[in-house]
UniProtKB/Swiss-Prot annotation:
Record SUPFAM superfamilies: PapD-like, Periplasmic chaperone C-domain
GO biological process, one term: cell wall organization
A Pfam short name: PapD_N
Subcellular location: Periplasm
Leader sequence residues: 1-26
Organism placement in taxonomy: Bacteria, Pseudomonadati, Pseudomonadota, Gammaproteobacteria, Enterobacterales
Physiological role: Part of the elfADCG fimbrial operon, which could be required for adherence to host epithelial cells. Could be required for the biogenesis of the ElfA fimbriae.
Stated family: Belongs to the periplasmic pilus chaperone family.
InterPro entries: Ig-like_fold, PapD-like_sf, Periplasmic_pilus_chap, Pili_assmbl_chap_C_dom_sf, Pili_assmbl_chaperone_bac, Pili_assmbl_chaperone_C, Pili_assmbl_chaperone_CS, Pili_assmbl_chaperone_N
This protein's name: Probable fimbrial chaperone protein ElfD
GO cellular component: outer membrane-bounded periplasmic space
Coarse class of the protein's main subcellular location: periplasm
This protein's UniProt keywords: Chaperone, Fimbrium biogenesis, Periplasm, Signal
Signals that turn on the gene: Induced in the presence of epithelial cells.
Amino acid sequence: MKTCITKGIVTVSLTAILLSCSSTWAAGKGGVGLAATRLVYSEGEEQISLGVRNTSPDVPYLIQSWVMTPDNKKSADFIITPPLFVLNPANENLLRIMYIGAPLAKDRETLFFTSVRAVPSTTKREEGNTLKIATQSVIKLFWRPKGLAYPLGEAPAKLRCTSSADMVTVSNPTPYFITLTDLKIGGKLVKNQMISPFDKYQFSLPKGAKNSSVTYRTINDYGAETPQLNCKS
């Protein structure tokens, strides 16, 4: 399930609602969708691409894109082309993303975010009294160095869990960012969580938990859930 943060934006002739959320290719009956829920930029690649589709039959959208750091600042280490363009009804386009920054960590992934804002056009007739919805889709972008000891597919099984009193600690000894989903502690579902490389996260023991056993799934490079695993100590 995706979570959206809603902000009100007021302009001279238009009141819009900006929705910031993760996006999938599907955009309902009309709107803008992305072809992926996450991106992986492998070291050595000249560029990667992201598809953007306008499923509306009659509304053009102004598309603006950029890359952000985890602290929500625009990154100057990436170029996206085209950075600004009009996406006509029932059309799609490719965003090309190129890394131009300094060398990054060689022993682990580095996290960025790709942001795509879609603003629907307004006709002269509509100006001043029309509510328009502008969507801002934000997806994770992982920069992945060459030569990591094992592929991402082997990483989920390497997580380790320890418990003490009313806390459970999940440790990630791998060089990958691992997103836990369908996460259960003592049989009780808890909030999804992403754990950074070589880091750990502490969970409070849920109310009614039978024990401190942990089961989980993770998200692969294609945005799909992996099979359920039991966390080892």
